[in-house]
């Protein structure tokens, strides 16, 4: 008997018909002799609707009360799926995040999981029940208030449950058949990948691939939990995220895929003194504004005045906060100008094979040049190349790179509904 954790996204439980279909899949898994724990997201666009409602009532909702409101969405879908399972003759019990033992930090809106104490879940499993856990939420270790986990929170909840319960696999159900070599909404012949290493998936998630969120993959790698990405609309096998690039033969010409991200902004600090300590002042200011940095580029110092420019990218949502913080410290830090650009896109090529194939970067740049895409910034890791371009050219760049590296499959990819979340 295996212990299986399943997670269903909002599009998978968007209405009564889809909820019943999900319940049938869960019951079928249970009848195969498995113990089953299910994590569900809020139905459809419920979270966005609740956010809109909150802002109509209060333009700046108190974070604690906003978390109380938003967690209601997952509790609703959780209970409805449990009812649907009961209607099919199986026994189910639903739990909120706090009832499931999800202990978090106290940061409302973006709490981190500290621990999971799943005693009540284990008791329910021993009673032969299907266990349902409301995703995206927990309880603060210090204040005992309800908290939300931020973007990708339900995925992270599912992997955390799998780790705490010692599950054999964590299945993430979405609206595509697995992880593809590119977004099938942009590249029609994107190829489904059978397996992806944790490192490759981390790079893909960090570069904008939306099927799995970065925090979820980090948690799975840390606890060595295999993650099986599947469609809730078909019985196709999906993609398994497992293992390390250390297990991939160095000489294998493996390129995993092309990822893209249109949610970033670019900040450039112009005329910064090129002496020790000034870059540190810039990034300390950004950190104090609670802004995570992605790509960084420092220009060669201008000999005539000893000044340099530093460019970094961050989420478009927090870009204005970074600019405001830096601008308030302009005289203290000593730069002359601040530039902000939120009309950029990031396109990335990921794959363990580029560790031993020196021509990859040249082909990458040639493919973009051939379709008239200008590279504004470039960043690399052992298994990734990322560049910035205009957001209007992003789709064109994705298609060009996918074709240049021969990543396409023989079949047209199927997208069943929604956005993959």
UniProtKB/Swiss-Prot annotation:
GO terms for molecular function: aspartate kinase activity; ATP binding. Pathway: Amino-acid biosynthesis; L-lysine biosynthesis via DAP pathway; (S)-tetrahydrodipicolinate from L-aspartate: step 1/4; Amino-acid biosynthesis; L-methionine biosynthesis via de novo pathway; L-homoserine from L-aspartate: step 1/3; Amino-acid biosynthesis; L-threonine biosynthesis; L-threonine from L-aspartate: step 1/5. GO terms for biological process: diaminopimelate biosynthetic process; homoserine biosynthetic process; lysine biosynthetic process via diaminopimelate; threonine biosynthetic process. Disulfide bonds: none annotated. It catalyses: L-aspartate + ATP = 4-phospho-L-aspartate + ADP. Substrate binds at residues 25-30, 45-49, 74, 125-126, 151-154, 274, 292-294, 298, 360-361, 374-375, 381-382. CDD domains: AAK_AKii-LysC-BS, ACT_AK-LysC-DapG-like_2, ACT_AKii-LysC-BS-like_1. Feedback inhibition by threonine. Its EC number is 2.7.2.4. Keywords: Amino-acid biosynthesis, ATP-binding, Diaminopimelate biosynthesis, Kinase, Lysine biosynthesis, Nucleotide-binding, Repeat, Threonine biosynthesis, Transferase. ATP binds at residues 7-10, 41, 174-175, 180-185, 210. It comes from the Bacteria. The record marks 7, 74 as: Contribution to the catalysis. Residues 267-348, 349-421 form the ACT domain. GO terms for cellular component: cytosol; peptidoglycan-based cell wall; plasma membrane. Belongs to the aspartokinase family. Heterotetramer consisting of 2 isoforms Alpha (catalytic and regulation) and of a homodimer of 2 isoforms Beta (regulation). NCBIfam families: asp_kin_monofn, asp_kinases, PRK06635.1-1, PRK06635.1-2, PRK06635.1-4. Catalyzes the phosphorylation of the beta-carboxyl group of aspartic acid with ATP to yield 4-phospho-L-aspartate, which is involved in the branched biosynthetic pathway leading to the biosynthesis of amino acids lysine, threonine, isoleucine and methionine. This is Aspartokinase.
């Amino acid at each position: 008997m295996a212990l299986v954790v399943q997670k269903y996204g909002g599009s998978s439980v968007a209405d009564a018909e889809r909820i019943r279909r999900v319940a049938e899949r869960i019951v079928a898994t249970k009848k195969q002799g498995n113990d089953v724990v299910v994590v569900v997201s809020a139905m459809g666009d419920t979270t966005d609707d609740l956010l809109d409602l909150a802002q109509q009532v209060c333009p700046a909702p108190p974070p604690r009360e906003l978390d109380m409101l938003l967690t209601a969405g997952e509790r609703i879908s959780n209970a409805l799926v449990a009812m649907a399972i009961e209607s099919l003759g199986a026994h189910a019990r639903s739990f909120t995040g706090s009832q499931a033992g999800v202990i978090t930090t106290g940061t409302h809106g973006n709490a981190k999981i500290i621990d999971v104490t799943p005693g009540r879940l284990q008791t329910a499993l021993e009673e032969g029940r299907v266990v349902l856990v409301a995703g995206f939420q927990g309880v603060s270790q210090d204040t005992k208030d309800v908290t939300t986990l931020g973007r990708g929170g339900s995925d992270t909840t599912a992997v955390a449950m799998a780790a705490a319960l010692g599950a054999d696999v964590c299945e993430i159900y979405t609206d595509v058949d697995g992880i593809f070599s590119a977004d099938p909404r942009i590249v029609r012949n994107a190829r489904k990948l059978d397996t992806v290493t944790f490192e490759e998936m981390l790079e893909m998630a960090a570069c904008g691939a939306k099927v799995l969120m970065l925090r979820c993959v980090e948690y799975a790698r840390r606890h060595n939990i295999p993650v099986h990405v599947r469609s809730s609309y078909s019985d196709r096998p999906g993609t398994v995220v497992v293992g390390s690039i250390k297990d991939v033969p160095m000489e294998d010409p493996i390129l995993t895929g092309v990822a893209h991200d249109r949610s970033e902004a670019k900040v450039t600090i112009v005329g910064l003194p090129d002496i020790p300590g000034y870059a540190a002042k810039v990034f300390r200011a950004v950190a104090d504004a609670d802004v995570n940095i992605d790509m960084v580029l420092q220009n060669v110092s201008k000999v005539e005045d000893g000044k340099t420019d530093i460019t970094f990218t961050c989420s478009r949502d927090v870009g204005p906060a970074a600019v405001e913080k830096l601008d308030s410290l302009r005289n203290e830090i000593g730069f002359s100008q601040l530039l902000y650009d939120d009309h950029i896109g990031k396109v990335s090529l990921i794959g363990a094979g580029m560790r031993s194939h020196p021509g990859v970067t040249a082909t990458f740049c040639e493919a973009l040049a051939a379709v008239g895409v200008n590279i504004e910034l470039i960043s690399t890791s052992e298994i990734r190349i990322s560049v910035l371009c205009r957001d209007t050219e992003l789709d064109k760049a994705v298609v060009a790179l996918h074709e240049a590296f021969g990543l396409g499959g023989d079949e047209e990819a199927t997208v069943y509904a929604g956005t993959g979340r």
